[in-house]
Amino acid sequence: SRLSRLSIATGVPFLVILAPGKGSYFREFLPKEYLEMKGQSENRMYEMWLDQLVLKGLRFLDLNSFFRLYTEVFPKNGIHWSEWAQVDAFNMISDTLLDILPDSLRPARLMIDSSYRSTIMEGTDDDIEQGLNLWRNIPDLEATYYNTHWEDVPAFKRPRILVIADSYAWGLVNKGLLREGYRDSEFWFYNQGVHGPNIVQKGASPQTVHGFSTKA
């Protein structure tokens, strides 16, 4: 493939991530009329991407299949994967990168100190609700959270990476991925907006970075 040839020519490895989608986990909440529409196929886009990645021999990590074995991957009132799932996803991505990076480089992992359950949502776990500008709170389901700290890996040993992704990456960026997990790295939001390692100081969310507000 063109991507593989570019990787070989530049000496820069790449990894494609297949993230889980909320519609695949909560199909019982999708409108019945939509599910019965002619030509509808469950997980069609995921299967299409997976087939092409395998066919072209591209290196990828299938987080969609991994997280299908777990519950509470998505919060009730959130768009994106749960806070705990983001931590597990980051560590899986970093572990996978270890196999393709030079031995002299390795990412820092998010070390899990403890976990707890709460009905008070944190991070992006209620970002649908926040974006709707509602006048009263929507009850949340109990969710799992981790207390974490970054593994102590010297900066010169951490690789620089380029993350090209949609808003699913914001949660990881919020946790310090660009500066603490890796070294002076960048996030290209939809391959349009370019954000560096200090973006977390701005609040690191599409709303704050691009001038949107959740306030009435």
Regions found by a protein language model. Give the residues of each.
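Extracellular glycan-modifying ectodomains
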Residues: S1-A216
